[in-house]
Amino acid sequence: INGDAKGTVFFEQETSEAPVKVTGEGLGLAKGLHGFHVHEFGDNTNGCMSSGPHFNPRNKEHGAPTDENRHLGDLGNIQAAGDSPTAVSITDSKITLFGADSIIGRTVVVHADA
């Protein structure tokens, strides 16, 4: 998270077949919905510009987290209250911490809006 916003996100997966639990907290986000995505590259030298597009190794269309046809990096939105910490609590069965499609080493982007 760049700018005045900051936060920490944790990814946990018990086995390669298990869903990934995403938890964490963001501070300083403006009130409202913020897109929450894994991007292709782990490069943050130029902020989000160097992180590349959403992680999409299977060349799918952009979609909601519950859609079968979606980028692997499409994790939906998080809701910020604006005056308190923003909780992140997502369980996702498409992303993985194992194998060729692993999200390890990539960038998590919290967008300015949904």
Swiss-Prot record:
SUBUNIT field: Homodimer.
GO MF: copper ion binding; protein homodimerization activity; superoxide dismutase activity
PROSITE patterns tied to this protein: SOD_CU_ZN_1
EC nos: 1.15.1.1
Cofactor(s) needed by this chain: Cu cation; Zn(2+)
Chief location bin: cytoplasm
The organism of origin for this protein: Drosophila persimilis
Protein family (similarity comment): Belongs to the Cu-Zn superoxide dismutase family.
Annotated binding of Zn(2+), by residue: 54, 62, 71, 74
Top enzyme category: oxidoreductase
One CC-aspect GO term: peroxisome
GO BP: any one term: regulation of synaptic plasticity
Span list, region Disordered: 48-68
Bias type Basic and acidic residues, positions: 58-68
Localization per Swiss-Prot or TrEMBL: Cytoplasm
Catalytic activity: 2 superoxide + 2 H(+) = H2O2 + O2
Name of the protein in its database record: Superoxide dismutase [Cu-Zn]
Keyword Metal-binding: yes
Co-factor binding comment: Binds 1 copper ion per subunit.
